[in-house]
C-alpha cells in the first residue's frame, strides 16, 4: 500500500491530473490485477447477505415505494428488481434494490475514520451488469474495486465530523466499480467519479433526530447517481474537477478546509484489492456499533437475572468509543433516542433502547424487537431511561487502531443493581466479527439467508438462487441472481408522480 496525500490546490496551481485522487482511483479501477480466491468467495458471501436482508424487507413500505418507482421505468434490456419479474432501467433497478438492502440496517459495515456499508455498492453494479449482459467474473472484479475504493476513502477521509453523510464515499466507489465492470478507460472513470461525488454530498440530518426512511433511500440514491454519472461520462461529458482538491471543492468547503491534508491509502499497481476482507457483516438488524453491545447484553442477562432481574437495576453505564457515544448514545443529545414513539430508524440508532431490549429478552429480532408494542412496554421504557453512555478514551483509541487484532467496536457495561451490587463485563467485537466468538463463514451467510427468506421466498427459489450465486465466477446469466416472491401482501402506499 502507498499513502496518497490529498489537499486543496488553488486554481492557479500546477496540479497535474495524474495527482488527482479521482485519477488515482481510476488507475486502481483499470488495474488488471486478478481477484484473489478469498476475495471472490467473500463477494459471493455479501451477495447472499444482501439477498437475505432484501428478502426480509421486500414487503415493507419504503421498499415497496422504491420498487413501484422502478416499475415506472421498464426497459427490454435492463436490470432486475428484487422480488418481481421484468427488466427495468438499471439506475432505477439499482435504486429499488438499494433500498431493499439498506432498509433493515442489517448488512455489512466498515468503520474507520468514517462509517460505511460497502455492500451498498452491489445493487448498482449488479443492475448494470444485468443490463449489459456482463459475466459473473466481470461483476466480481467490479465489486472488488468498489469495496477497495470505499474502504480506502473510509480509512482516509472523515465526513461525519463535518456533518456530511457517509454516502459521499459511496458515489465515487460505485462509479469506480462500474468502470472496472464495464472495462472503460481511465478518463471516463475519472469523470464519472467526479460527478458521482458532486451529486452525493448530503448532510447527516438523515441520521439525526427523528430518523426517517430516507436513511435507506440515501445509499440507493447514491448508487443511482453513480450509474447516471457513468452513463454521462461514457457519452463524453466532463465533471467538476478536481472534485476533492479544487479551490471550491469538497475538501475546501465541505470538509476540513484548505489547510488540511488527508492521507488516503491506495494499493500499488498490481497489488490485489483486498479491502472487502476487512469489512464485516451483521448478525443483528441494528447500527453496527450496537452489534457487540447486543451480544454483551445477551451474555450478561443470566448474571442480571441471578441478581434479581432487570426490574431491580438502578443504572447502566456503557463505556464506549467517541463514535458510539455521539452517534447512537446519549452524547448525541437526541431526545428521540429515548422516545417510545420513535421511528424504527431512530430506535436502531439508540444503543440505550437496543441494550435494554437485548438485556430483557436475551435475543434480538429484526422485526419483533422494534414493534411499537415492544418499544412502549412500561418496564422496558423504565430500564431504557436508566441507561447512558460515556466516552472512554481507551475505547476510542481501539476504535481507531490500525491493528485489526486491537480494533474494537464494543463497550464495557457497568450495571448497578438497586442493592448496590455491581455487574461488569465488556466485549470488544461482535460474535459474528472475524475475530469474534462465532465468525461468519459461508454457512452462516446461507443460514442468515434461509432464516430471513423463510415464509417469503419459496424453498425451490431459495435453492435456485444459492446454486447460481455460488457459481458466480462461471455464471453468464446474471439475471439468475434475482429472486422473485409473492408481493401481494406488500405494504400499502400512496400514489406518486412516476
UniProtKB/Swiss-Prot annotation:
It is an enzyme of class 4 (lyase). GO terms for molecular function: 2-methylcitrate dehydratase activity. It catalyses: (2S,3S)-2-methylcitrate = 2-methyl-cis-aconitate + H2O. Catalyzes the dehydration of 2-methylcitrate (2-MC) to yield the cis isomer 2-methyl-aconitate. The prpD1B1C1 operon seems not to be involved in propionate degradation. NCBIfam families: PrpD_hiGCgrampos (NF042438). Monomer. Belongs to the PrpD family. This is 2-methylcitrate dehydratase 1. The gene is prpD1.
Amino acid at each position: 500500500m502507498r499513502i496518497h496525500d490529498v489537499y486543496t490546490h488553488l486554481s492557479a496551481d500546477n496540479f497535474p491530473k495524474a495527482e488527482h485522487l479521482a485519477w488515482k482511483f481510476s488507475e486502481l479501477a483499470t488495474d488488471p490485477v486478478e481477484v484473489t480466491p478469498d476475495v471472490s468467495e467473500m463477494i459471493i458471501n455479501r451477495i447472499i447477505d444482501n439477498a437475505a436482508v432484501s428478502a426480509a424487507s421486500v414487503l415493507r413500505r419504503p421498499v415497496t415505494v422504491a420498487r413501484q418507482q422502478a416499475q415506472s421505468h421498464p426497459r427490454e434490456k435492463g436490470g432486475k428488481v428484487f422480488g418481481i419479474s421484468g427488466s427495468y432501467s438499471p439506475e432505477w433497478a439499482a435504486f429499488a434494490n438499494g433500498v431493499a438492502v439498506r432498509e433493515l440496517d442489517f448488512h455489512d459495515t466498515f468503520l474507520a475514520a468514517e462509517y460505511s456499508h460497502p455492500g451498498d455498492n452491489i445493487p448498482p453494479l449488479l443492475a448494470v451488469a444485468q443490463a449489459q449482459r456482463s459475466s459473473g467474473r466481470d461483476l466480481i472484479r467490479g465489486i472488488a474495486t468498489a469495496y477497495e475504493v470505499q474502504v480506502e476513502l473510509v480509512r482516509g477521509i472523515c465526513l461525519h465530523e463535518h456533518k456530511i453523510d457517509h454516502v459521499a464515499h459511496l458515489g465515487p466507489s460505485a462509479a469506480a466499480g462500474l468502470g472496472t465492470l464495464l472495462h472503460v478507460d481511465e478518463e471516463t472513470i475519472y469523470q464519472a467519479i467526479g460527478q458521482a461525488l458532486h451529486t452525493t454530498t448530503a448532510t447527516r440530518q438523515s441520521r439525526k433526530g427523528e430518523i426517517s426512511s430516507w436513511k435507506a433511500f440515501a445509499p440507493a440514491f447514491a448508487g443511482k447517481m453513480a450509474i447516471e454519472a457513468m452513463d454521462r461520462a461514457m457519452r463524453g461529458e466532463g465533471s467538476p474537477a478536481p472534485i476533492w482538491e479544487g479551490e471550491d471543492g469538497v475538501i475546501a468547503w465541505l470538509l476540513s478546509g484548505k489547510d488540511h491534508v488527508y492521507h488516503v491509502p491506495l494499493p500499488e499497481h498490481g497489488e490485489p484489492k483486498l479491502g472487502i476482507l476487512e469489512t464485516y457483516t451483521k448478525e443483528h438488524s441494528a447500527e453496527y456499533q450496537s452489534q457487540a453491545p447486543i451480544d454483551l447484553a445477551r451474555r450478561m442477562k443470566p448474571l442480571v437475572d441471578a441478581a434479581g432481574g432487570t426490574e431491580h437495576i438502578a443504572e447502566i453505564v456503557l463505556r464506549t468509543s467517541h463514535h458510539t457515544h455521539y452517534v447512537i448514545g446519549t452524547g448525541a443529545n437526541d431526545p428521540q433516542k429515548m422516545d417510545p414513539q420513535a421511528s424504527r430508524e431512530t430506535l436502531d440508532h439508540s444503543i440505550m433502547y437496543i441494550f435494554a431490549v437485548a438485556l430483557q429478552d436475551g435475543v434480538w429480532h429484526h422485526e419483533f424487537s422494534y414493534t411499537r408494542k415492544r418499544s412502549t412496554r412500561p418496564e422496558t421504557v423504565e430500564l431504557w431511561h436508566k441507561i447512558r453512555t460515556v466516552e472512554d478514551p481507551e475505547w476510542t483509541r481501539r476504535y481507531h487502531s490500525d491493528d485489526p487484532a486491537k480494533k474494537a467496536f464494543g463497550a464495557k457495561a457497568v450495571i448497578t443493581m438497586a442493592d448496590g451490587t455491581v455487574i461488569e463485563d465488556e466485549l470488544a467485537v461482535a460474535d459474528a466479527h472475524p475475530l469474534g466468538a462465532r465468525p461468519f463463514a459461508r454457512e452462516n451467510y446461507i443460514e442468515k439467508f434461509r432464516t430471513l427468506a423463510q415464509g417469503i421466498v419459496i424453498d425451490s427459489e431459495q435453492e435456485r438462487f444459492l446454486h447460481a450465486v455460488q457459481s458466480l465466477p462461471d455464471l453468464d446469466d446474471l439475471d439468475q441472481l434475482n429472486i422473485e416472491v409473492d408481493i401481494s401482501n406488500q405494504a400499502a402506499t400512496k400514489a406518486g408522480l412516476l
